[in-house]
Regions:
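Surface "functional belts" at beta-alpha junctions
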Residues: 21, 88-134
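Short glycine-rich anion-binding loops that position phosphate/pyrophosphate groups of nucleotides
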Residues: 11, 64-65, 115-118
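Phosphate-handling active-site elements
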Residues: 48-54, 83-94
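Glycine/Thr-rich phosphate-binding loops of Rossmann-like dinucleotide-binding domains
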Residues: 14, 69, 119
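Short amphipathic alpha-helical face segments that pack within enzyme cores
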Residues: 37-40, 76, 80, 97
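N-terminal beta-alpha supersecondary unit
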Residues: 1-63
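Generic, well-ordered alpha-helical segments
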Residues: 30, 34-37, 69-73, 90-91
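DPxDG-like acidic metal-binding loop motif
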Residues: 58-89
């Protein structure tokens, strides 16, 4: 089975389909019409990957921090996908995801996300076996 990951927390709408490895992804600059753009992106990567939506077994959603309205749109679309397919929705903190992706096992990490209007969210992490902790 496949997983769908969605991020609408920033200037870009990003979606990806993966199992043990990345199968297909898309990242598109969002100016207006986030809902339509997100649905179109999901449709495009499923078609490109030749995967039926019914083959998706879980949706991972970036729940922020980030742009408030875009996060709400991402949540609404993700809930609709999960509700229609009867699959779980797993929330993922964007700062935690960045730290985990950047960890080397040896250095402290500070993740920073622009949350609009010259405001930023950040968090410090330290390495532990298998990942990072706040």
């Amino acid at each position: 089975m496949y997983s769908l990951s969605i991020s609408t927390s920033g200037k870009y709408i990003s979606v990806a389909i993966h199992d043990d490895k990345l199968i297909s992804s898309s990242s598109v600059l969002s100016e207006n019409g986030t809902t339509n753009l997100l649905m179109k992106s999901i449709d495009e990567i499923t078609k490109k990957s030749r995967i039926e939506k019914s083959d998706i077994s879980v949706v991972y959603l970036d729940i922020g921090p980030g742009y408030y309205t875009s996060l709400r749109i991402g949540l609404a679309v993700a809930q609709g996908v999960c509700g229609s397919l009867g699959i779980p929705l797993v929330p993922v903190n964007g700062l935690d995801a960045l730290a985990f992706a950047a960890h080397t096992g040896h250095r402290k990490i500070c993740t920073i996300i622009d949350i609009k209007r010259e405001e930023y969210a950040f968090c410090l992490y330290k390495p532990v076996p298998g990942g990072v902790v706040r």
